[in-house]
């Protein structure tokens, strides 16, 4: 069972105050000793002063944390200092368990495999605190391996109280599904943009576990003859550092009526079927799009499909001219 070394209330208060007044602040695990394949969350309540997050740096290594996710929440999933937020893995009966967010979750940032720091483009920021829907930051750390010593994995966040003219958000395209034994399979998802926004994608990130070979994201526009026109957002080997990298076309825009899609190529050389899930023995198919808007960002930033074998672009989404 993980053991927790709690910070004092004075230390927490000092940290919360520094978040409002400093240009760089940290959110860290308070000395946890995790078991293998554990997902742990800790949260920070934001002040009434609006802030704009403009940069992120992981304070860990891939040998310690498998990945780190930073969520913006209206309310955290728990009032505990640290809690088990691995909703898809086996629960620990002796540890408080809850989702990452109690309401209105929004993925802000993701890190894995020794990815370098990320600085957002000039004049772009994630709006948090104040009158925004994000009243708390929640950091989720996936520890793939158990640890013997207390761990303080965290994130260094660059922020400013100066309003940024372009608001940032992160969209996640993700699938479920099953990867059959001794087979290479394609996992696909596609969603129509239904909200009245103009998205300017500037960075993308891919994530799978060890069976991932390639992950790509595409913008699809349909013409009056119902012919689909595909434009690459980004394509990457998920075994490389899982950093946010620039999109292929920085002038690209995604608008109401367009379709965003993602595809993961996974290769299974094992004599067992592999399900999509949270543990080291499962797989994942994730494609993140970081974008900015001149006005409000989208309310729904998740695109999900059940994945293979139940979902295919040509069959369920009725897409044509699909790239290889």
Swiss-Prot record:
It is found in: Secreted. Binds 2 copper ions per subunit. It catalyses: a [peptide]-C-terminal glycine + 2 L-ascorbate + O2 = a [peptide]-C-terminal (2S)-2-hydroxyglycine + 2 monodehydro-L-ascorbate radical + H2O. Its cofactor is Cu(2+). Its main location: secreted. Residues 1-22 form the signal peptide. Cu cation A binds at residues 66-67, 142. InterPro entries: Cu2_ascorb_mOase-like_C, Cu2_ascorb_mOase_CS-2, Cu2_ascorb_mOase_N, Cu2_ascorb_mOase_N_sf, Cu2_monoox_C, PHM/PAL, PHM/PNGase_F_dom_sf. It comes from the Eukaryota. The keyword Metal-binding applies. GO terms for molecular function: copper ion binding; peptidylglycine monooxygenase activity. Cu cation B binds at residues 207, 209, 284. GO terms for cellular component: extracellular region; membrane. Glycans are attached at residue 182. Its EC number is 1.14.17.3. It is an enzyme of class 1 (oxidoreductase). Monooxygenase that catalyzes an essential reaction in C-terminal alpha-amidation of peptides. Produces an unstable peptidyl(2-hydroxyglycine) intermediate. C-terminal amidation of peptides such as neuropeptides is essential for full biological activity. Belongs to the copper type II ascorbate-dependent monooxygenase family. This is Probable peptidylglycine alpha-hydroxylating monooxygenase 1. The lineage of its organism: Eukaryota, Metazoa, Ecdysozoa, Nematoda, Chromadorea. The gene is pghm-1.
């Amino acid at each position: 069972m993980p053991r927790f070394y709690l910070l004092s209330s004075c230390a927490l208060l000092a940290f919360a105050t520094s978040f409002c007044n400093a240009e760089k602040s940290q959110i860290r695990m308070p000395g946890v000793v995790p078991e293998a394949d554990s997902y742990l969350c800790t949260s920070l309540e934001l002040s009434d002063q609006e802030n704009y997050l403009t940069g992120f740096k992981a304070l860990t290594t891939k040998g310690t944390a498998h990945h780190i996710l930073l969520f913006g929440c209206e309310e955290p999933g728990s009032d505990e200092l640290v809690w088990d937020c691995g909703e898809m893995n086996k629960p620990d009966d002796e540890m408080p368990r809850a989702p990452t967010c109690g309401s209105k979750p929004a993925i802000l940032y993701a890190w894995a495999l020794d990815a370098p720091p990320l600085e957002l483009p000039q004049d772009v920021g994630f709006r948090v605190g104040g009158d925004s829907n994000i009243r708390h930051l929640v950091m989720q750390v996936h520890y793939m391996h158990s640890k013997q010593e207390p761990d303080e994995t965290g994130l260094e966040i660059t922020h400013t109280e100066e309003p940024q003219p372009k608001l940032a958000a992160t969209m996640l395209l993700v699938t479920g599904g099953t990867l059959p034994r001794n087979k290479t399979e394609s996992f696909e998802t596609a969603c129509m943009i239904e909200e009245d926004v103009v998205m300017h994608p500037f960075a993308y990130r891919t994530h799978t576990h060890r069976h991932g070979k390639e992950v790509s994201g595409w913008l699809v526009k349909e013409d009056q003859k119902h012919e689909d026109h595909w434009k690459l957002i980004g394509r990457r080997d998920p075994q490389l550092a899982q950093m946010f990298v620039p999109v292929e076309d920085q002038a690209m825009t995604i608008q109401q009526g367009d379709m965003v899609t993602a595809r993961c190529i996974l290769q299974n050389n094992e004599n067992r079927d592999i399900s999509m899930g949270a543990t080291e023995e499962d797989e994942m198919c994730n494609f993140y799009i970081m974008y900015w808007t001149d006005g409000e960002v989208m309310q729904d930033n998740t695109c999900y499909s059940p994945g293979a074998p139940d979902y295919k672009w040509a069959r369920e989404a009725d897409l044509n001219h699909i790239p290889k």
